[in-house]
Regions:
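Short, surface-exposed "cap/lid" segments of acyl-processing enzymes
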Residues: 362-413
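Conserved alpha/beta-hydrolase "acid-adjacent" motif
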Residues: 592, 616-622
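N-terminal cap/lid segment of alpha/beta-hydrolase-fold proteins
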Residues: 294-370
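Alpha/beta-hydrolase-fold enzymes
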Residues: 471-567
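Alpha/beta-hydrolase active-site loop
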Residues: 424-449
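N-terminal targeting leaders of membrane proteins
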Residues: 22-122, 214-284, 664
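Short beta-strand/loop motif that positions the catalytic acidic residue
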Residues: 603, 609-611
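Catalytic histidine-centered segment of alpha/beta-hydrolase-like enzymes
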Residues: 640-651
Length: 664
């Protein structure tokens, strides 16, 4: 069981970065009726490798879909009704250091699996590394409770298994097969996992050293395994549009990485060359242009690399109270900021799902005037109200004394089937009207429940959320907003929706030349670099090329569109950004943007902008337009590309100043 849950956890922890590089999923089943059809290989039709196609190729066909979905439903129910209650109790009794120590010890005991797996694939050096790790961690790590092999000596685990060994022998993986709590999704890999258990000492220890309490050691240790897995499960699987496909594709991707020993090899590459081998040199940021009307910020110590690489730094923007040292997230004693955010719902219209939002009240110690401040947070395209960036912004506002409401972005699938009333977004003026109606409903809900009183409302949104802020300003100007607003702040908004879509499409375009083998090679090479950087934030930028960063950024921004179309229409879609614009957005709305409401933005003193001079979603005319339209109501950062400066103190201070939460 330990190996089961540990592998499951690893697969789910990888999911965030796998999404970013292109392993995503669509809603394959709506209303209980499957709509999935066999897919044509991308390489066969010379199309671009969309996020959906990458996920399909890695996970493969699902010939036993009915059986597999039933097995997944069994696992999902067990996680909800058995595992979750047990986990809450366990994590509230044992502190996180104890749970992690036990996890390390169990991992150390599984040395025979990794040793045999690497030896059978002819990787003698890997087998020797595993032997050294076992010896060091057993002696110096007090039976494996700690990991000095990695932390002191730079000896890394291969995470090898017999599933990967069978793959290197050329054994086909066979049909997709999902079994409850078996962290493999193909016949070959499930067989390898079962044989792994024969090499696991815990399989036999129960026979020789009974616990005396009616259950074996493996079962007694199961809650500890669960504690390490359930948070990633809830964050990456339960929150997806189709949890079954999310699970199947994430586990298939993790299995592929383990087969190639990808993370192990990259960690050794980093150890051999701490500065990495492909990181581009630091570039000189743009200098303040002559005659600039807006404010100007140079970010101390930012070290810009390349625009797409710098954009990935938005991953550094997360709540500061996000990793309680003593207690796991499931514990009643956990102090993470996310536990302070109440997830609420509000009815929008009959026949549609209630729309969700997050709410965190102002601190009790806030001044009376500050406690009246209520700030709505609208994340970027596809963003969720409980995403790391939305919560980080809410924490920033909360710590400044305000209450905060986090919303799903209107291009999010949950929002589309609730607050957007089942209408695909893209007609920005109409989308903004439905957004304002949702915001009015939220204000009424909070007032009705005594959570806010006579609130002074502000709004902050970034990327596509920033563009929606601009259209809320037009509604205010036309007297259609429905509530009084104090300040509206748009961060890194694209000026021209059509130009932004074209830029994203151009970033994905080079993938048309990739064969299937080249795509898999890129996936195995780039994903470990993102995974490792996501954990250690090495030098603040991931160790990937600008070309790969462009594809990563574009795949992430575009991944939400197939989900939207599938959820709303009930038919599986792999729509590209350009096809979405031409196929689902009315002709009259395709060229809307900030320039079409220039007079409103120029004359509305409530609206301000924060932007970067090197944002690839702007061209030279866009930058001139913003500077001339907003004047001293715009702040320019010298670097950061598209939202890649959010983690810096300079940006955080400017947000609070523009929202009038601190003095400028």
């Amino acid at each position: 069981m330990k190996n089961t849950v540990k592998s499951l956890m690893a697969g789910l922890m990888a999911t965030g970065c796998l999404i970013a590089y292109g392993v995503t999923w669509t809603h394959l089943e709506t209303g209980g009726a499957s709509v999935a059809e066999p897919h044509e290989s991308v390489s066969a039709k010379n199309a671009e490798w969309s996020a959906l196609q990458v996920g399909r190729e890695i996970a493969g066909e699902d010939d036993w879909r009915g059986f597999n979905r039933f097995m997944f439903a069994v696992q999902d129910a067990a996680m909800d009704y058995i595992a979750t209650p047990i986990n809450h109790v366990y994590c509230s009794v044992l502190p996180k250091p104890v749970i992690r120590g036990v996890d390390n010890a169990i991992d150390n005991s599984e040395y025979p699996i990794r040793f045999v797996a690497t030896l059978l694939r002819g990787e003698g050096g890997c087998a020797w590394d595993e032997t050294k790790r076992f010896a060091v961690n057993t002696v110096l790590g007090i039976g494996g409770l700690f990991d000095p092999a990695k932390n002191w000596f730079g000896i890394f685990s291969t995470e090898a298994s017999l599933s990967g060994t069978f793959a290197t022998w050329g054994i086909p993986r066979g049909p997709s097969l999902v079994l409850p709590f078996v962290p493999r999704v193909h016949v070959r890999d499930c067989a390898g996992y079962i044989l792994d258990q024969g090499l696991d000492p815990k399989t036999y220890i129960d026979f020789f050293f009974p616990t005396g309490i009616g259950i074996g050691w493996s079962a007694a240790l199961w809650p500890n395994d669960l504690a390490m897995a359930i948070d990633p499960w809830n964050a990456n699987i339960k929150s997806s549009v189709d949890p079954y496909e999310a699970y199947r594709r994430a586990i298939a991707a993790k299995t592929l990485l383990d087969e190639k020993l990808a993370v192990y090899h990259y960690m050794n590459e980093l150890a051999a060359n701490e500065k990495g081998t492909r990181r581009p040199p630091v570039r000189r940021p743009p200098q303040r242009p002559a005659g600039l009307k807006g404010r100007w910020w140079d970010i101390a110590g930012y070290k810009p690399r390349a625009p797409a690489i710098d954009t990935l730094r938005i991953r550094l923007f997360a709540p500061t109270r996000d990793n309680d040292f003593w207690w796991m997230r499931s514990s009643v004693f956990n102090g993470d900021f996310a536990k302070d955010v109440a997830m609420r719902t509000v009815a929008i219209a009959p026949g549609f799902q209630d729309a969700r939002y997050g709410f965190v009240p102002a601190p009790a110690h806030s001044a009376p005037q500050q406690r009246k401040r209520l700030v709505f947070v609208i994340p970027g395209i596809g963003g969720e109200c409980d995403s790391a960036s939305a919560l980080a912004m809410a924490e920033l506002l909360h710590d400044a004394g305000a209450s905060a409401v986090t919303l799903d972005n209107p291009f999010n699938w949950r929002y589309a089937i609730s607050a957007n009333r089942g209408i695909l977004p893209g007609n920005l003026p109409e989308d903004a009207r439905r957004l304002s109606a949702f915001m009015r409903a939220v204000i009424d809900d909070l007032s009705r429940n005594g959570l806010v009183d006579d609130a002074e409302v502000s709004v902050v949104g970034w990327s596509m959320g920033g563009l929606f802020v601009s259209y809320l300003a037009k509604l205010e100007n036309d007297g259609e907003l429905g509530f009084k607003v104090d300040t509206l702040l748009a961060v890194n908004p694209p000026v021209d929706f059509n130009y932004a879509i074209s830029t994203i499409e151009s970033f994905i375009e080079p993938s048309k030349s990739w064969s299937r083998e080249q795509m898999l090679e890129k996936f195995v090479d780039v994903t470990p670099r993102l995974l490792v950087w996501d954990k250690i934030h090495f030098d603040s930028t991931p160790d990937i090329s600008e070309e790969d960063a462009r594809y990563t950024v574009a795949a992430f921004l575009a991944a939400t569109l197939p989900e939207l179309v599938t959820c709303v229409t009930g038919k599986e879609s792999s729509v590209s950004p350009r096809d979405y614009l031409t196929g689902f957005v009315p002709d009259s709305a395709r060229h809307v943007g900030m320039k079409t409401i220039e007079d409103v933005l120029r004359g509305n003193a409530h609206v301000s902008v924060i932007h970067t001079r090197d944002d690839f979603l702007l061209d030279a005319d866009d930058r001139d337009f913003l500077d001339n339209t907003f004047g001293d109501r715009i702040t320019w950062f010298s670097a950061g590309a598209h939202c890649g400066m959010f983690h810096t103190p300079e940006f955080k201070r400017e947000v609070l100043a523009r929202l009038k939460l601190i003095e400028e």
